[in-house]
Amino acid sequence: VKTMLFLGRHVGFPVALEGALKLKELAYIHAEGFAAGELKHGPIALIEDDLPVVVVVPSPNGRPVLHSKIVSNIQEIRARGAKTIVIAEEGDEDVRPYANWLLEIPGTTSLMQPLLSTVPLQFLAADIARQCGNQDIDKPRNLAKSVTVE
């Protein structure tokens, strides 16, 4: 894997950004996070065969319009040959047919969902890092523990 895309909508957008950042820090792979609502305004041009795309799906029990829009995004991504890694609530049958890999999280409130969605992304980044040869994921190269603002 040379690059990965991460998509999220609503509270899932910052989760997508965090997932991309964690993958860059641990596996040294190019990754970008995007707002799913912006997919047709540029990021869709990056979609190609076998490109891994992680999608953070909002709860179907929250705002139904957000859920249906991201299911549509996943369909568009799959139609272009990408491989989808979908993080969704347990029992979300709407996304199952379009997920190459489905990572299920327990159902919760919309504002708590980012906490549950972030953990699988951290494990994913750690696993990919190890597969890429970075066995010391607790000490990523070139990262500072603090930043000095001048």
Regions found by a protein language model. Name each.
Residues 1-150:
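A SIS-like phosphosugar-recognition module
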